Amino acid sequence: MFEKIICHDENKKLFEKCIHGGNISHAYLFFGKDGIGKCTFAKEFAKELLNVENLDSSTEYKYISRLEGKKDIVIEQIRKELIDDVYERPLSGNYKIYIIDDAQYLNISAQNALLKTLEEPPDYVVIILIASSMSYFLPTII
């Protein structure tokens, strides 16, 4: 598990324990400098939860990031890619995983729209926010 991840030994141990113990949270915030492996770690975690080798072939996985040429991740994008989909139960497996990369670009409206799902998610949903800092988020998100 997490063989492709270099370093991050403490995090690997923690997440392995969570997976084996069935103690999976509905939301995670991975933050830190660019290039330290946050997205790679999130994707490996998603692979473990979904029991797949290739996330792109899984119907239970969505990767969300800023659309090309856009300054922010806007409410319409969050509604379309996450909120409209989140209440459909997984077709296979126990989880639906949503990774929001560069989540610091979620504008205020998008954060507010996401808040209800973060506060009252379906039991099968895991949302992973990836950002350079926590300071970009509304206090209610953190």
Residue ranges and their predicted role:
Residues M1-N112, K116:
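Clamp-loader machinery-focused feature within the broader ASCE/P-loop NTPase space
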Residues L55-S57, P121, I141:
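Short, structurally constrained coil/turn elements
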Residues D102, L129-M134:
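A short beta-strand-to-loop transition that corresponds to the Sensor-1 phosphate-sensing loop
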Residues L106-N107, P121, Y136-F137:
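Catalytic P-loop NTPase motifs of RecA-like helicase/translocase cores
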Residues A113-L118, M134-I142:
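Short regulatory helix/loop adjacent to the ATP-binding pocket of P-loop NTPases
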Residues P122-V126:
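His-Asp phosphorelay/catalytic-motif detector in bacterial-type signaling
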